[in-house]
Amino acid sequence: MAGKVQEERKINKFPRLTINTRCSKLISNSEKGHKFPKEKPILVTCGLPYVNGPAHIAHLRTYVPADIFVRFLRKMGQEVVFFCGSDTHGTPITVKAEAEGVTPKKIMEKYHQHFVEFFPKIGIHFTNYGSTDHPLNHNRTIQIVDALKENGYVYSKMLALPYCPTCDRFLPDRYQRGVCPHCGASARGDECDQGCGRYLEPGELMDPRCSICGTKPEMIETRHYFLKLTAFEEFLREYLPAMDGTDIARNYALKWVEGGLKDWNITRNLDWGVKVPGEEGLVYYVWVDAPIGYIASTEEWAERTGGDWEYYWKGPGHLIHFIGGDIVYHHCLFWPAMLKGAGYDTPYAVVASGMVRVEGKIFSKSRGYVIWVEEDYLDRGLDPDALRYYIASYTGHTRDLDFNWSTYGEKVNKELVGTLGNFLYRALLFAHRNYGAIPEGEVEAEVRAEVEKAIEAIRDGLDEYQFKKISDAVLALAAYGNRYLQSREPWKLTKTDPEKAQGVIHNCLWLTKALAVLMEPVMPGKAAAIWRQLGQARRDAPLSEALEPLKVETILGKPAPLFEQIPEETIEELSEMVAKRIAEAEG
């Protein structure tokens, strides 16, 4: 490929970081061919939340699985860092700001702070959570585009674009609506959001109208910059089949490559965004600076801790992106091309999820098919760990998740209360009442085999990026615990064979400890509660701890149920809330 960056890599200059990015001894993955953990470092990112509104249920489809993945990697001794940040530029923010009579910066700052405070409430803790409006992101965006220019991958040309004479401005992206040239559906300026989902280049939209005033725009020529995406077609044909991750990411991207690539307009006529040096009223398109925000977030962390961001972006490691299924195009075509052309490492994996539905309908904020995580869930006192479990366990990661309150209630009541919580509370309560401490005993071979089976299923789930396999393994182990406890009947043995009863409870508490280890990445708050009831204040125990012996004679904490039954009346009330919202949106 012409114009390759002449940049010395200096891999050996990167020091091992002084912070604890590796939480336990590295577990071998050679015996059964597991992908993870890896000897090389891993950087995990999540698609940036767009800060024109609060967190909703569709956000969690990306962030919860990514957090589960990172937590398990750390349990296996993997060196891993986890980055995200707010996506702060683009027309959705400027349109909202105009509607509310405030500046785009006010909108951005309000919702950026919302997400900073929100993620810990749902148990998600990033190594760094940044912002694409941070000066580091402005600088890194300009540096990367400059590198692409130097290597012959960016050029400028005059382009006829829609201009609204009534509003006296060009109409980038969401400032116009019209007809998709590919499928004929109603579409916005940069994407067919109601039909085929295709990315639309400026000027492609048919029969455009100003989305603010409805005026039919004039076409006026103006200078814009383009990424020569066509120059990366051969690279993408080789890269995408080898890219790890979910099939929908690879297959969708390959389908678009097979259909023929076009050069990509990387600038917009706006004042809000990363300004193009030397060009008045021109900024880089939001999908240029947004993924660069992953790099800038790493730089923010490096400045704060004394780390080296290049260790992850130009070094020996693996880059893994977790994204929603609606942004595959950007992460599997534009982004690898930009990284390749500017001399950065390309992603090892792109993990794209299925879409989200609410009450059977395609997720839509404007049409009322939305669940606001704080207003509708957390503020009502509902359990954040139960929601994490629901997101992980509802279906396979690449299948559509259809959120409805009835299914949520059924999962909580049957699986969390009836199976997992039932075993844990029965085992801990019996032990506390009869012994007060962890009794002596030997772990039975059958019991140990069940835990080993659960660990293997979890590692398979990590390899395949299938988080339902992980939650199913936890639930299956709890179901086994219930069967074991019921079949051994220690309440009878305390009278007929006290020593055997003690051994049964020892095994039950050993299973309880294993569950605390294995469920922590899915339900960290509940795992911490189990450790306290086991008489320990542990967090982030390594995966190997699931198979380690109990500390006999440890004084047990006071047992308490982990989960609460959700009454049918509450489910009906929550379902009615969504129905009312939909009815109001539909007028």
Task: Tell where the protein language model's regions lie, with residue ranges.
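Structured secondary-structure scaffolds
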Residues: 31-84, 136-139, 209-433, 470-474
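Short acidic alpha-helical/loop segments enriched in Asp/Glu that coordinate divalent cations
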Residues: 430-445, 467-473, 484-496
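N-terminal, positively charged nucleic-acid-binding surface of large information/translation enzymes
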Residues: 26-238
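Short, solvent-exposed positions on alpha-helices
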Residues: 247, 418, 465-472, 521, ...
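Long, amphipathic alpha-helical stalk/connector segments used for oligomerization, subunit docking
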Residues: 403-407, 412, 430-439, 451-467
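Extreme N-terminal basic, low-complexity initiation segments
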Residues: 2-6
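Basic, alpha-helical terminal appendages of large translation-related enzymes
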Residues: 7, 12-13, 19-41, 85, ...
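Generic structural concept
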Residues: 417, 421, 448, 452, ...
